[in-house]
């Protein structure tokens, strides 16, 4: 007949001078003989139900004691019916987090996005760039790109042109206006035909030219 471990302890206690009663206490979580669980004739395991809790490493905890069952588990309290574990209120994960680890009770952000993505390209935080001649953009700390479009002045001509790498249109021939279908320069009087002399309104290039009729040689004045 196999000798139980706790029976051996009891025999030792009755031998004077060898083992005192202080050698085994309630701190050692003794299990009753009837609570021992045997998987075969050679192995005997103590059953701690109602007396304590055991973690993944085999450590025993008292009733009411707080402990972590495993590395990735949340804290638990040892109760009569076994560990009672509650999920704590975990910190919020950063919305720009690109790498989250779940090795502990709460998920933990290990890497936060530190760049901006704009039209398929990545830019560093606070980096300024020009995606087009008319745009000035910057990568903000919020990982968002803010852009400003150039505020171009109204050209003082009716035929502005766009030069390469320039955002705003320019008047290559200076200010002008329309005299009928003819473009005339501003600031001077221009004879547009045999009978009409025209000039642009000062500063009002979008208005049609002001024209005056003169006597025409060989033609009747309209």
UniProtKB/Swiss-Prot annotation:
Predominant localisation class: secreted
Single GO cellular component annotation?
Answer: extracellular space
Secretion signal, residue range per the UniProt entry: 1-21
- PROSITE patterns under this entry? VWFC_1, VWFC_2
Give UniProt keywords alphabetically: Developmental protein, Repeat, Secreted, Signal, Synapse
BP terms from Gene Ontology: negative regulation of BMP signaling pathway; positive regulation of neuron differentiation
Record's keyword annotation contains Signal: yes
Q: Which InterPro entries match?
A: VWC2/VWC2L, VWF_dom
- SUPFAM superfamilies (alphabetical): FnI-like domain
- UniProt keyword Signal, yes or no: yes
VWFC domain boundaries: 51-110, 114-172
Q: Where in the cell is it found?
A: Secreted; Synapse
Self-association and partners: Peripherally associated with AMPAR complex. AMPAR complex consists of an inner core made of 4 pore-forming GluA/GRIA proteins (GRIA1, GRIA2, GRIA3 and GRIA4) and 4 major auxiliary subunits arranged in a twofold symmetry. One of the two pairs of distinct binding sites is occupied either by CNIH2, CNIH3 or CACNG2, CACNG3. The other harbors CACNG2, CACNG3, CACNG4, CACNG8 or GSG1L. This inner core of AMPAR complex is complemented by outer core constituents binding directly to the GluA/GRIA proteins at sites distinct from the interaction sites of the inner core constituents.
General function of this protein = May play a role in neurogenesis. May play a role in bone differentiation and matrix mineralization.
Name under which the protein is recorded: von Willebrand factor C domain-containing protein 2-like
Organism source for this protein?
Homo sapiens (Human)
Q: Which gene is transcribed and translated to give this protein? A: VWC2L
């Amino acid at each position: 007949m196999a000798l139980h471990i706790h029976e051996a302890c009891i025999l030792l206690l009755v031998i004077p001078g060898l083992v005192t009663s202080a050698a085994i206490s309630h701190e050692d979580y003794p299990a009753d003989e009837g609570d021992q669980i045997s998987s075969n004739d050679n192995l005997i395991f103590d059953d701690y139900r109602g007396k304590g809790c055991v973690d993944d490493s085999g450590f025993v905890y008292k009733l009411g004691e707080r402990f972590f069952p495993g590395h990735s588990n949340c804290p638990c309290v040892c109760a009569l019916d076994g560990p009672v574990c509650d999920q704590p209120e975990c910190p919020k994960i950063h919305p720009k987090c690109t790498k989250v680890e779940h090795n502990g009770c709460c998920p933990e952000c290990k890497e936060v996005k530190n760049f901006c993505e704009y039209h398929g390209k990545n830019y560093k935080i606070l980096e300024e760039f020009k995606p087009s001649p008319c745009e000035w953009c910057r990568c903000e700390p919020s990982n968002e790109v803010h852009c400003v479009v150039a505020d171009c002045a109204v050209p003082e001509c009716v035929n502005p042109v766009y030069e390469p790498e320039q955002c705003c249109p320019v008047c290559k021939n200076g200010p002008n206006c329309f005299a009928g279908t003819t473009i005339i320069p501003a600031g001077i009087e221009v004879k547009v035909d045999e009978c009409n002399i025209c000039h642009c309104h000062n500063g009002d290039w979008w208005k049609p030219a002001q024209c005056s009729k003169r006597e025409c040689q060989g033609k009747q004045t309209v």
